[in-house]
Amino acid sequence: MTVAKRIIPCLDVDGGRVVKGVKFVDIRDAGDPVEIARRYDAMGADEITFLDITASHERRDTMVQVVEKVASQVFIPLTVGGGIREVADIRRMLNAGADKVGINTAAVARPEFVAEAAERFGSQCIVVAVDAKQVSRADEPARWEVFTHGGRKATGLDAVEWAGRMAELGAGEILLTSMDRDGTQAGFDLALTRAVSDAVPVPVIASGGVGTLSDLADGVLEGGADAVLAASIFHFGRYTVAEAKRLMAERGITVRITGDERTDV
Protein backbone atom coordinates (compact mmCIF):
# COMPACT_ATOMS: atom_id res chain seq x y z
CA MET A 1 0.00 0.00 0.00
CA THR A 2 1.41 3.38 -1.04
CA VAL A 3 1.61 5.93 1.75
CA ALA A 4 -0.01 9.24 0.81
CA LYS A 5 2.30 12.23 0.61
CA ARG A 6 1.37 15.09 2.89
CA ILE A 7 0.86 18.81 2.36
CA ILE A 8 1.60 20.80 5.50
CA PRO A 9 0.93 24.54 5.76
CA CYS A 10 3.41 26.20 8.11
CA LEU A 11 2.38 28.99 10.43
CA ASP A 12 5.22 31.10 11.83
CA VAL A 13 3.85 32.63 15.03
CA ASP A 14 5.15 35.75 16.75
CA GLY A 15 3.28 37.17 19.71
CA GLY A 16 0.18 35.13 18.92
CA ARG A 17 -0.01 36.22 15.28
CA VAL A 18 0.96 34.40 12.09
CA VAL A 19 3.77 36.08 10.18
CA LYS A 20 5.91 35.13 7.20
CA GLY A 21 9.29 36.52 6.35
CA VAL A 22 11.80 36.22 3.54
CA LYS A 23 14.88 34.30 4.67
CA PHE A 24 13.66 34.69 8.27
CA VAL A 25 13.75 38.49 8.14
CA ASP A 26 11.48 41.25 6.80
CA ILE A 27 8.47 39.78 8.61
CA ARG A 28 4.92 40.62 7.58
CA ASP A 29 1.68 39.73 9.34
CA ALA A 30 -0.45 37.01 7.78
CA GLY A 31 -3.30 36.81 10.28
CA ASP A 32 -4.84 35.04 13.21
CA PRO A 33 -3.51 31.49 13.77
CA VAL A 34 -6.80 29.97 14.88
CA GLU A 35 -8.72 31.25 11.87
CA ILE A 36 -5.98 30.25 9.46
CA ALA A 37 -5.69 26.78 10.98
CA ARG A 38 -9.46 26.29 10.71
CA ARG A 39 -9.31 27.31 7.07
CA TYR A 40 -6.54 24.84 6.33
CA ASP A 41 -8.41 22.05 8.10
CA ALA A 42 -11.46 22.78 5.95
CA MET A 43 -9.31 22.93 2.82
CA GLY A 44 -7.98 19.42 3.39
CA ALA A 45 -4.47 20.08 4.68
CA ASP A 46 -2.93 16.89 6.06
CA GLU A 47 -1.24 18.55 9.03
CA ILE A 48 -0.34 22.01 10.31
CA THR A 49 3.01 23.10 11.70
CA PHE A 50 3.38 26.02 14.10
CA LEU A 51 6.81 27.57 14.57
CA ASP A 52 7.14 30.00 17.46
CA ILE A 53 9.81 32.22 15.99
CA THR A 54 10.42 34.26 19.13
CA ALA A 55 9.96 31.51 21.71
CA SER A 56 11.03 33.63 24.68
CA HIS A 57 10.11 32.31 28.09
CA GLU A 58 8.01 35.41 28.73
CA ARG A 59 5.84 34.73 25.69
CA ARG A 60 5.61 30.95 26.03
CA ASP A 61 2.13 31.19 27.56
CA THR A 62 0.91 32.91 24.40
CA MET A 63 1.91 29.96 22.23
CA VAL A 64 0.35 27.46 24.61
CA GLN A 65 -2.91 29.40 24.41
CA VAL A 66 -2.75 29.40 20.62
CA VAL A 67 -2.25 25.63 20.54
CA GLU A 68 -5.11 25.07 22.98
CA LYS A 69 -7.49 27.16 20.88
CA VAL A 70 -6.46 25.56 17.61
CA ALA A 71 -6.59 22.00 18.96
CA SER A 72 -10.14 22.57 20.15
CA GLN A 73 -11.28 23.51 16.65
CA VAL A 74 -8.97 21.69 14.25
CA PHE A 75 -8.86 17.94 13.82
CA ILE A 76 -5.72 17.27 11.84
CA PRO A 77 -2.28 16.67 13.41
CA LEU A 78 -0.53 19.73 14.84
CA THR A 79 3.23 20.08 15.18
CA VAL A 80 4.66 22.84 17.37
CA GLY A 81 8.28 23.96 17.33
CA GLY A 82 10.35 26.82 18.65
CA GLY A 83 11.81 27.06 22.12
CA ILE A 84 11.44 23.36 22.92
CA ARG A 85 14.39 22.92 25.28
CA GLU A 86 13.42 20.32 27.87
CA VAL A 87 11.01 17.49 28.60
CA ALA A 88 8.66 19.86 30.42
CA ASP A 89 8.28 21.96 27.26
CA ILE A 90 7.27 18.88 25.27
CA ARG A 91 4.79 17.76 27.88
CA ARG A 92 3.26 21.22 28.02
CA MET A 93 2.71 21.41 24.27
CA LEU A 94 1.32 17.88 24.05
CA ASN A 95 -1.03 18.62 26.94
CA ALA A 96 -2.16 21.76 25.13
CA GLY A 97 -3.21 19.63 22.16
CA ALA A 98 -0.15 19.30 19.93
CA ASP A 99 0.40 15.91 18.31
CA LYS A 100 4.12 16.43 17.65
CA VAL A 101 6.86 18.79 18.75
CA GLY A 102 9.75 20.15 16.74
CA ILE A 103 13.22 20.32 18.28
CA ASN A 104 16.05 22.31 16.72
CA THR A 105 18.56 24.29 18.78
CA ALA A 106 18.19 22.05 21.84
CA ALA A 107 19.10 19.01 19.74
CA VAL A 108 22.35 20.65 18.68
CA ALA A 109 23.15 21.77 22.22
CA ARG A 110 22.38 18.36 23.71
CA PRO A 111 21.75 15.56 21.19
CA GLU A 112 20.80 13.09 23.92
CA PHE A 113 17.71 15.25 24.54
CA VAL A 114 16.25 13.77 21.36
CA ALA A 115 16.77 10.24 22.66
CA GLU A 116 15.25 11.16 26.02
CA ALA A 117 12.24 12.75 24.35
CA ALA A 118 11.69 9.80 22.04
CA GLU A 119 11.92 7.35 24.93
CA ARG A 120 9.53 9.38 27.07
CA PHE A 121 6.91 10.31 24.49
CA GLY A 122 7.58 8.04 21.50
CA SER A 123 9.40 8.74 18.24
CA GLN A 124 6.11 9.36 16.47
CA CYS A 125 5.77 12.77 18.12
CA ILE A 126 9.40 13.92 17.92
CA VAL A 127 10.32 15.99 14.85
CA VAL A 128 13.87 17.31 14.56
CA ALA A 129 14.07 20.52 12.56
CA VAL A 130 17.25 20.86 10.52
CA ASP A 131 17.94 24.33 9.10
CA ALA A 132 20.64 23.91 6.46
CA LYS A 133 22.68 26.32 4.38
CA GLN A 134 24.95 25.40 1.48
CA VAL A 135 28.57 26.11 2.38
CA SER A 136 30.38 24.49 -0.55
CA ARG A 137 31.72 26.42 -3.50
CA ALA A 138 30.36 25.88 -7.01
CA ASP A 139 33.38 23.78 -7.96
CA GLU A 140 33.08 21.51 -4.89
CA PRO A 141 30.76 18.61 -4.09
CA ALA A 142 27.60 20.00 -2.52
CA ARG A 143 27.82 20.35 1.24
CA TRP A 144 25.34 21.87 3.68
CA GLU A 145 25.86 23.04 7.25
CA VAL A 146 23.34 23.06 10.10
CA PHE A 147 22.41 26.50 11.44
CA THR A 148 20.46 27.37 14.57
CA HIS A 149 18.83 30.45 16.09
CA GLY A 150 16.75 31.16 13.02
CA GLY A 151 19.68 30.67 10.68
CA ARG A 152 21.97 33.10 12.47
CA LYS A 153 24.38 30.69 14.15
CA ALA A 154 26.60 28.23 12.31
CA THR A 155 27.23 24.92 14.05
CA GLY A 156 29.92 23.28 11.93
CA LEU A 157 27.70 20.20 11.59
CA ASP A 158 27.18 18.54 8.22
CA ALA A 159 23.43 18.65 7.61
CA VAL A 160 23.11 15.24 5.96
CA GLU A 161 25.16 13.49 8.63
CA TRP A 162 23.29 15.35 11.36
CA ALA A 163 19.90 14.28 10.04
CA GLY A 164 21.07 10.69 10.06
CA ARG A 165 22.29 10.97 13.63
CA MET A 166 18.98 12.48 14.75
CA ALA A 167 17.10 9.56 13.21
CA GLU A 168 19.39 7.14 15.02
CA LEU A 169 18.67 8.89 18.32
CA GLY A 170 14.93 8.52 17.85
CA ALA A 171 13.57 11.37 15.75
CA GLY A 172 10.41 10.20 14.02
CA GLU A 173 10.65 12.80 11.26
CA ILE A 174 13.11 15.36 9.90
CA LEU A 175 11.80 18.82 9.06
CA LEU A 176 14.42 19.99 6.56
CA THR A 177 14.55 23.69 5.72
CA SER A 178 16.87 25.21 3.14
CA MET A 179 17.92 28.55 4.59
CA ASP A 180 19.11 29.58 1.13
CA ARG A 181 15.65 29.08 -0.34
CA ASP A 182 13.37 30.06 2.54
CA GLY A 183 10.97 32.79 1.46
CA THR A 184 12.48 33.14 -2.01
CA GLN A 185 9.73 31.18 -3.83
CA ALA A 186 12.48 29.72 -6.04
CA GLY A 187 11.64 26.09 -5.25
CA PHE A 188 13.07 23.58 -2.80
CA ASP A 189 16.79 22.85 -2.71
CA LEU A 190 16.20 19.48 -4.36
CA ALA A 191 19.79 18.32 -4.05
CA LEU A 192 19.69 18.90 -0.29
CA THR A 193 16.28 17.26 0.02
CA ARG A 194 17.36 14.21 -1.95
CA ALA A 195 20.62 13.86 -0.03
CA VAL A 196 18.84 13.83 3.33
CA SER A 197 15.94 11.67 2.13
CA ASP A 198 18.42 9.07 0.90
CA ALA A 199 20.40 9.20 4.15
CA VAL A 200 17.66 8.69 6.75
CA PRO A 201 15.14 5.89 7.37
CA VAL A 202 12.43 8.25 8.66
CA PRO A 203 10.10 10.62 6.78
CA VAL A 204 11.56 13.90 5.54
CA ILE A 205 9.46 17.06 5.33
CA ALA A 206 10.82 19.44 2.68
CA SER A 207 10.67 23.13 3.54
CA GLY A 208 11.92 26.42 2.19
CA GLY A 209 11.33 28.03 -1.18
CA VAL A 210 7.93 26.96 -2.50
CA GLY A 211 6.64 29.38 -5.12
CA THR A 212 4.47 27.21 -7.36
CA LEU A 213 2.42 24.04 -7.11
CA SER A 214 4.99 22.27 -9.27
CA ASP A 215 7.59 22.96 -6.58
CA LEU A 216 5.55 20.81 -4.18
CA ALA A 217 5.45 17.91 -6.61
CA ASP A 218 9.15 18.28 -7.36
CA GLY A 219 9.93 18.00 -3.66
CA VAL A 220 8.38 14.54 -3.67
CA LEU A 221 9.36 13.27 -7.10
CA GLU A 222 12.87 14.71 -7.33
CA GLY A 223 13.70 15.40 -3.71
CA GLY A 224 12.28 12.18 -2.32
CA ALA A 225 10.37 13.99 0.42
CA ASP A 226 7.53 12.28 2.25
CA ALA A 227 5.79 15.59 2.95
CA VAL A 228 6.04 19.15 1.68
CA LEU A 229 5.67 22.27 3.77
CA ALA A 230 4.70 25.70 2.51
CA ALA A 231 3.52 29.04 3.84
CA SER A 232 3.29 32.08 1.58
CA ILE A 233 1.64 30.40 -1.41
CA PHE A 234 -1.24 29.35 0.82
CA HIS A 235 -1.35 32.17 3.37
CA PHE A 236 -1.91 34.92 0.82
CA GLY A 237 -4.40 33.03 -1.34
CA ARG A 238 -2.30 32.37 -4.42
CA TYR A 239 -3.17 28.67 -4.34
CA THR A 240 -5.37 26.37 -2.28
CA VAL A 241 -4.49 23.01 -0.78
CA ALA A 242 -7.06 21.42 -3.10
CA GLU A 243 -5.28 22.84 -6.15
CA ALA A 244 -1.97 21.55 -4.81
CA LYS A 245 -3.33 18.05 -4.31
CA ARG A 246 -4.90 17.98 -7.77
CA LEU A 247 -1.59 18.92 -9.36
CA MET A 248 0.29 16.33 -7.33
CA ALA A 249 -2.25 13.63 -8.20
CA GLU A 250 -1.96 14.54 -11.88
CA ARG A 251 1.78 13.92 -11.60
CA GLY A 252 1.21 10.47 -10.17
CA ILE A 253 1.68 11.25 -6.48
CA THR A 254 -0.62 9.55 -4.00
CA VAL A 255 -2.39 12.15 -1.85
CA ARG A 256 -5.25 12.02 0.62
CA ILE A 257 -8.48 13.27 -0.94
CA THR A 258 -11.49 14.13 1.22
CA GLY A 259 -14.84 15.62 0.38
CA ASP A 260 -13.70 19.05 1.50
CA GLU A 261 -10.85 19.08 -1.00
CA ARG A 262 -13.18 18.77 -3.95
CA THR A 263 -14.27 22.34 -3.40
CA ASP A 264 -11.81 25.13 -2.73
CA VAL A 265 -12.43 27.05 0.48
UniProtKB/Swiss-Prot annotation:
A single GO CC term for this protein reads: cytoplasm
GO-annotated molecular function: imidazoleglycerol-phosphate synthase activity; lyase activity
Q: Which cysteines are joined by disulfide bonds?
A: none
Subcellular localization(s) per the UniProt record: Cytoplasm
Superkingdom of the source? Bacteria
| Alphabetical list of InterPro entries matching this protein | Aldolase_TIM (IPR013785), His_biosynth (IPR006062), HisF (IPR004651), IGPS_HisA/HisF (IPR050064), RibuloseP-bd_barrel (IPR011060)
| Gene3D superfamilies tied to this protein | Aldolase class I
Q: Does the keyword Secreted apply?
A: no
SUPFAM superfamilies for the chain? Ribulose-phoshate binding barrel
Which reaction equations make up its catalytic activity? 5-[(5-phospho-1-deoxy-D-ribulos-1-ylimino)methylamino]-1-(5-phospho-beta-D-ribosyl)imidazole-4-carboxamide + L-glutamine = D-erythro-1-(imidazol-4-yl)glycerol 3-phosphate + 5-amino-1-(5-phospho-beta-D-ribosyl)imidazole-4-carboxamide + L-glutamate + H(+)
Please provide the record's keywords in A-Z order: Amino-acid biosynthesis, Cytoplasm, Histidine biosynthesis, Lyase
Q: Which GO terms are recorded in the biological process aspect for this UniProt protein? A: L-histidine biosynthetic process
| Assembly and oligomerization | Heterodimer of HisH and HisF.
Would you tell me the protein name for this molecule? Imidazole glycerol phosphate synthase subunit HisF
Classification lineage: Bacteria, Pseudomonadati, Pseudomonadota, Gammaproteobacteria, Chromatiales
Gene encoding this polypeptide? hisF
